[in-house]
């Protein structure tokens, strides 16, 4: 078929490459540090996460906790975010456990390293810092996801007045490189950063309706 235009990898060839880790944020983002109610990973890394014993709970002065704030540094979001990964033949899901490690809840045999997943400072405007998640597959290959902002997808919040402000949060870590077991052979991926051209602003409009009686 001489009239058919070939793809970038050749005629009748398809290149299936890439992959990503995507996140469904539950409550506050796990990796965002806030003055109150940091995410789970941020609280663990900052040493604010404490597992109380039964004796601790019995001694907790609830009536003073709000007024005098005896325990201000123990506030954090307990609900872990849900991470889904999909690359090549591999797919699965994991969360961050109470020790700050990744725990697979679907898809077995994967080792997930969060040591280079950065804790982000709270911001509603600034791009996130470098953040990397590493996954070792059952066949021994090491996959790197994320890196600088070109390998990250993140959302800038639209914070209308009178609502609780949301921070900038990473939504996806894109596959950035692959290494074999020997780490002598590998491949790297590069991405071009771009910002969304169209921006939509959320606003609130309140109307009060009723009847008025005149006597």
Model-derived regions, located:
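Generic marker of "main functional regions" within proteins
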Residues: 25-27, 155, 185-188, 197-201
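Long, intrinsically disordered, low-complexity, charged/polar and glycine-rich segments
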Residues: 1-174, 180
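Solenoidal tandem-repeat scaffolds enriched in leucines and small polar residues
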Residues: 188-215
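Acidic, low-complexity segments
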Residues: 138-140, 180-186, 192-194
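A short, hydrophobic secondary-structure junction motif
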Residues: 174-184, 214-215
